[in-house]
Amino acid sequence: MGKMKNEKYNIQELLQRDVYVNDKKVGTIVGERHHPNEARVRSMRIQVESDVADEYMRKPAELAPLPKELVHSIRNDGTVKLSKSMRELQRRWRNTVRIDEKLYAPDEMQDRAVLDNQGREIGVITKLFKIKRTYKGVIVKTRLGIQKDFAVEDELRIPITAFSRTRERLDEVVLSRTFEKVLQLPSYISINEINEE
């Protein structure tokens, strides 16, 4: 029943609406990921109230994901009601990555193109990588040209700390330096030596 309920809202209906858990305002829906495959877009972007960010995040972030499955209904006053508690939202926010002081859910990172700071496409994120129950990196399927030019495997890991920003409209995530420099980072070297959990 709950599932049917939230299937019927599209992002246009939810944009700029305030989100509540009971009487607590969590934030405002500001959009969602630009991805050609709608089924892949499982989260919306929410601008989080600063008191909520302070209380429910390890380190406050202004923008965070809101899983679509948590949307229960639109109330009579036009606000969005969530089906779960703040505790559940907090749990979801712990399961994110932080880039440029914004939080991203794993589903928002998958399939994103990875570019270096010169605009060269390195490859596409296939999944995220955890160390001690925390996402520390992404697994990237590299482009053929990159494999040839840099003698790298068809899959490699890039640490989250190597990213400087995302480009929402283009569904890209951008490295803070050239790919050549990324390959020399101690964090890059160590993450590629670790066994996956």
How would you name each of these model-derived features?
Residues 1-197:
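Peripheral interaction segments used for macromolecular assembly
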